[in-house]
Amino acid sequence: MPLTSPQVPTVEIDVFGHTIRLPELRRYRKFYDKLRAGKWEARTFQVLGKHLDEQTHYVDIGAWIGVTAFWASHVAKSVIAVEPDPDCVAILRQLSPSYPNVKVLAGALARGPDIRLHAVGDFGSSETTALNVGDGPSVLAKGLAIEEIMGQAAAGPVFVKIDIEGYEYEMASEIAKLRRYDLRGMQCAVHPQLLEKSLTGPLPLRRLRTLVKTWQFGRLLPGYYAVPGRRYSSFLSFLTFGIALRRVPGGTDLVYYKQA
């Protein structure tokens, strides 16, 4: 259910060498067990540790409850946490004063002035999406172009992380604008299963369209190459075994490294 209290109790958790403060809410307790055990997105923290330093800004588009944003505040010059989910925004705004170099932007990556978000179950989860695939309530959120988001980061190198639950495909042209900036790299979660679910037509056609759009997404940033999660040996392996040959496509985090 939506947050009704202006203040949420907090808990401190050690995550890959840094302590972060998060909301002490029952719905997140199982997740926190995984986080404490180092079993949640270990590769993400390795990637952030490699790319962030005191000269580099971090932009987190789809910041959820602040796990990676607050962790990055210990190592990055500044952090821009972008989040449209109303419950998550309330959490971020309450907790961010503990991290002076973190700025919260309430809104979603979009082309227009606003965008409708759909909850999966309820708001506050990590699955809120702009795709019309949720089974919960919906809300209108402020739309933020990539220029508005990147304008919040001061001059200097930047690393961008994006996790917007399937809407990354629709926002590909906005994300591609990142090549105009001093981009050290990017990590973007791709959700082909959500894309395929949102498409119409027979399954073979939807699967083909999903494959094509994902292939195009891997080539989004000229001068960078996309590397999927460890279970795949290459981007082609992800297309083949993660999408084409699976009953339901699987997602992965694509890390875009600058070519030498």
Regions found by a protein language model. Name each.
Residues 1-260:
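Phosphate/nucleotide-binding beta-alpha loop and adjacent structural elements of enzyme active sites
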